[in-house]
Amino acid sequence: MTDASEGPGKETIDAASLVAAAGSVAVLTGAGISTDSGIPDFRGPQGVWTLNPVAEQASRIDVYLTDPEVRKANWRVMAGGMWDGVEPNVGHRALVDFDRRGGLHTLVT
């Protein structure tokens, strides 16, 4: 790991060169991209499913479709203001910029 004041390391420069040579790329992100915005991930130490294992049930389509209590609990959480004050972070903005420049072929999250 290099100190940020030293500039990008060799691995970062090599990755940037590969992306530039590709023209456009597919990007795969997970919930972790949003943690800097204050949105918890799922399996991390403060993750949604780590702190509330029952919440994982809402992610299973078979359970979600057949259990009205799971659906109700999920909608209560979603409507409870958990998104208030949340703003895109530098990672989100970088992906938007990358897309606007034509470098993003596909984004899967």
Task: Report the location of each language-model feature.
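Conserved catalytic core of sirtuin-type NAD+-dependent deacylases
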Residues: 1-109
